Amino acid sequence: RDALLAFKFKRRIEDLNAYGVLMAEKAAEVYADRFDAVTWVPVSKQRLKKRGFDQSRMLCASLCVDWHTEPQETLRKVRDNPAQSGIGDPAERRANVLGAYEPVDPDAIAGKRFLLIDDIITTGATLTECVRVLKAAGAADVVCLTLAMARDN
């Protein structure tokens, strides 16, 4: 737990390659042949500036190294909403991310199947919203993979 939180909030990236290998192995095992491209849940420009990095993008890129492919940027976070980690109620978490993302290029999304990468899943609100946006932009399918799951799940 401490290592993941240090990675997410303090940019402690010494375990990044191991995380990428672990996620690549799990994705191949669980989702083999179910996706055409790999993408990630982005952070807002404001959070990127504050934190200095996008942890889900880094996880996605690390996973893609193992497969000799490039991640595809599909989503843009258009609203710097309060951090999900500070919200406990699942309904409030869903409302907090509603409308926070938009497709970067719907034409590049249409008809493709995506593996969507995020760092930690708690209630699934963020992933659900990102899947909704990708499918509304024409994605044929979206499967999700996270590095960790919150204890309550």
Roles of regions detected by a PLM:
Residues 70-153:
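PRPP/pyrophosphate-binding module of the type I phosphoribosyltransferase fold
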Residues 1-65, 90:
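Extended interfacial segments that mediate partner engagement and assembly in macromolecular machines
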